[in-house]
Amino acid sequence: MRFLTLAAAAAIAALSTAAQSADIKIICSNGFHAVMQELGPQFERATGHKLVVSYGLAAVLGKQIEGGESFDLTILAPPQIDALLKQGKIAADSRTVLARSGMGVMVRSGAPKPDISTVDAFKRALVNAKSIAFPPQGQSGIYLVGLIERLGLTEALRTKMMPIANGPMTGETVARGEAELGITPIGELLAVKGVALVGPLPAEVQNYIVQTAGVSAAAAQGAAARDFLKFLMAPANTHVIVEKGMEPGA
């Protein structure tokens, strides 16, 4: 599969209109970090381009772009991408749905994994946990707070919930043993060393975070950015998105 991935990169590189290597500035949500970690270096080796990537919460990154932050390609949630489209900051023909990621529960590597196979089991796991780390400011954290309220667990979990700045830091908190459970999009937690995926949330209460890309309408490296976007969507790279806990092109 790795050979196919590199072959896809080489083919895409041949399509590029750029005469020489370029620095592609990418503003990317934390949820796509794991995919970028694997496919980014492959694209760089195959094309000679360099990816200059900054990560963060989609909502925060969207505001930065609205405030004038320059970029060539951005990967955010649909609300941010669509808002930027309306403002003319993203090329209208470049909006691309890359993948979606369900939310999952993590524990420290080697720790016992609770049963979360049903809604009732999931509720028991939350109640029995000593502490639960989550990113409250992101789309997933906002959903989780609402879900806990719908499940009638707000009071039971009030002293157990540990708000953490973002998904990756949530995973790091669990990896250090400072929280027993962590709940984030699966695509974010799989990028963190020292944690293990317990499983996705039960289907009845699952929530999906969609990763959507767009090329800047004022991109300094527009052609190279579009080449990288094509590379991310190449059939030979679908397996990487799946391995990182996401569904491609959802």
Question: Whereabouts are the PLM-identified features?
Answer:
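Residues at the start of alpha-helices and the adjacent loop-to-helix junctions
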Residues: 2-5, 13, 162
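Exported/periplasmic ABC-transporter solute-binding proteins
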Residues: 20-67, 75-101, 106-250
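C-terminal segment of classical bacterial N-terminal signal peptides
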Residues: 12-20
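Bacterial N-terminal signal peptides that target proteins for export
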Residues: 1-8, 18
